[in-house]
Amino acid sequence: MASRAGPRATGTDGSDFQHRERVASHYQMSASLKNEIKKLIYAHLVIWLLIAAQMCVSHLKLVSKDLVAMPYQWEYPYLLSLVPSLFGLVSFPRNNISYLVISMISTGLFSIAPLIYGTLEMFPMAQQLYRHGKAYRFIFGFSAISVMYLLMVVAVQVHGWQIYYSKKLLDAWFTNTQEKKKK
């Protein structure tokens, strides 16, 4: 469309963006942290499915005990670790602070605590494997201790980052609620 100033009206060439509003930083942070936490929850779901599959296969005796070892005691309470992740997912759509706090606390209780107990439970067998090279439990030909410790290292990192990002998300949400109260 032509104008008096030339072939294009002034301000329509894309140079008028400086005055436009921007998204507040805590909203940007909230969106990115929700995305990161969702990725961690999906990683946790994969770990949970591996442990649940190992437990189902061993309890239902689908394969011999030589192929898949019986589960350790820490694996049973770890199965409850799916509940905190569900609370975390439920808290996202409406920025529900109480569900996120429940998710953070129960992640420590149902996820981190069983992993710490599992580390202590398997330590004597890991020591025996290290000193004498003897393993008595196997998962598909690999030492069950080695496989479970590897899984535990990944799980601790996933849950640790999940709690860290949840705390940062909680701070971003509190910033948002404090600004609303001031108005």
Curated annotation (Swiss-Prot):
Transmembrane segments: 40-60, 72-92, 100-120, 138-158
Record-linked InterPro entries: Jagunal (IPR009787)
Compartments where found: Endoplasmic reticulum membrane
GO BP, sorted A to Z: defense response to fungus; endoplasmic reticulum organization; granulocyte colony-stimulating factor signaling pathway; neutrophil differentiation; neutrophil mediated immunity; neutrophil migration; protein transport; vesicle-mediated transport
Ranges of the Lumenal topological domain: 61-71, 121-137
Keyword field: Endoplasmic reticulum, Immunity, Membrane, Protein transport, Transmembrane, Transmembrane helix, Transport
Keyword Nucleotide-binding: no
Membrane topology: Multi-pass membrane protein
Membrane topology, Cytoplasmic segments: 1-39, 93-99, 159-183
GO CC aspect terms: endoplasmic reticulum; endoplasmic reticulum membrane
Family membership: Belongs to the jagunal family.
Known function: Endoplasmic reticulum transmembrane protein involved in vesicle-mediated transport, which is required for neutrophil function.
Protein name: Protein jagunal homolog 1
Organism this protein belongs to: Xenopus tropicalis (Western clawed frog)
Taxonomy of the source species: Eukaryota, Metazoa, Chordata, Craniata, Vertebrata
